[in-house]
């Protein structure tokens, strides 16, 4: 049985669970639980696998959540599912909380995207205007440097954007082809977990965490659009593209990226998807909304790369020119201000887009984004002013310092073992780009608690700012009086302190998960069982009846697996009863044995895999306690606990 990943986790019936990792690869593993009482080749299962699922329009679920099917009385059937009607109600409540299907594209979302476009145009436009001004005044050296940073950032962004377009376009075509082949009579499209399927070394992964969800959503939508409905009718939108249509798309995208308009095109496409989600009916609204979310996550990542490859060095360059010439022109001031705003905006906007595109993260409010913007604005302002002051006196040593700091930060990022890109060399390039970001500001690249790493980073930044400012003050030019030097130093340290205060405010009052100070990593808010409330009749059921239901389902799944000629991939079994002791009695928990090596998954997918399995199986069995996952390499307890925590 070939494992095909469509990137969805859903509750197909009150006693049916399906999961596939957010990874578009033939090498990716997947998990599927067959509904008790349904043979593996039944028509009901084939209808669900074709894309009907829990979505009325058959669009499939491109989100990592649990939802209940709304057809065929599935909410009220299946006493063995552990709850009948109550189980369906509990699953519906879980779907509303985890899937966030009630979210709509609002006016604030549109204004936020338009503001991002305005910030981008202001940043790039003022840089080009200033470069032309330098050329007209005969300052060819400043003109060359200013234009170089503009071209460097733009070309880098176009390369990344076109690379992502190629990957998305090929993924949609491959998923459409796969779904079409599954629609043939007699085709076996069931998915199971196999250790060999997940252990491939050459697995293809998208470039960033949000792109994993984005590509899964796009391939899922392409696959479900080409699927059959319950009456056997084929959707028109799922047909293969003609050769002329594909050629036109390739030609259009090539021209857009050659003209350096890839980022603008993605912004316009994001607005278009948001408007479509508003105009569509209830059946298709969420599909366009989540496509908009993932597209905005992509363009936010591109904006982030552009700002730190173009705006950050541009800001340091212009401030250094101002300090050296002892004069400030209006255009230079506008350029520096636009670059600083673009840097802070890109960081805050990317964090919002990343959280919005992940179902295992709570969305961040606009007030929290504003606090994040102020945090990054003031810390980056202190950093670049320090760089400008130091570079005005020590040009050579400033270059050595930047290269040394970048090497250390890149080594630190590589040591964190990020797994965001498709190949090893792309991963190295990505780590090198993030190392450039670390020259100016903090950027989280690893799941888990960041308190220690955040403290170390800003402590190092404070030491560097102090040393560079002190060296500038001691060796500054004689014509620079203390009337200018003392206020400059005050601006540096007061700006850094203000940014740290905003950072503490964000984590203390505006973090989506609540206050982050004095909280242990195993608090109740991280427990998947608290994400929804169980029905009363289920909550009062005894552990013995639940255990009996588990054994019946396990025996039935064992019988189906042996009939299909494969060994069951994961087993749900009750643990041995605890030995008598003086400790209070523990609630019996389930152990899910998964025939996979957990460390073969990238960090972000491991987190989503664990969370999704717990939520799905907990809703499936209505157990009073979340089950425990046991991988082949379960000896790495510290690693497993590390990805249980959130930012």
Swiss-Prot record:
GO terms for biological process: apoptotic process. Residues 1-44, 197-238 are annotated as: Disordered. The modification Phosphoserine is found at residue 197. The chain crosses the membrane at residues 112-132, 142-162, 245-265, 303-323, 328-348, 362-382, 393-415, 425-445, 454-474, 484-504. Changing residue 322 to S: Displays constitutive phospholipid scramblase activity. It comes from the Eukaryota. InterPro entries: XK-rel, XK-related_scramblase. Highly expressed in expressed in the brain; weakly expressed in the spleen, thymus, uterus, blood vessels and fetus. One of its GO terms (cellular component) is plasma membrane. Residues 21-31, 207-236 have a biased composition (Polar residues). Keywords: Apoptosis, Cell membrane, Membrane, Phosphoprotein, Transmembrane, Transmembrane helix. Phospholipid scramblase activity is activated upon caspase cleavage to generate the XK-related protein 4, processed form. Does not act prior the onset of apoptosis. It is found in: Cell membrane. The keyword Membrane applies. Its main location: membrane. The record marks 564-565 as: Cleavage. Belongs to the XK family. This is XK-related protein 4. The gene is Xkr4.
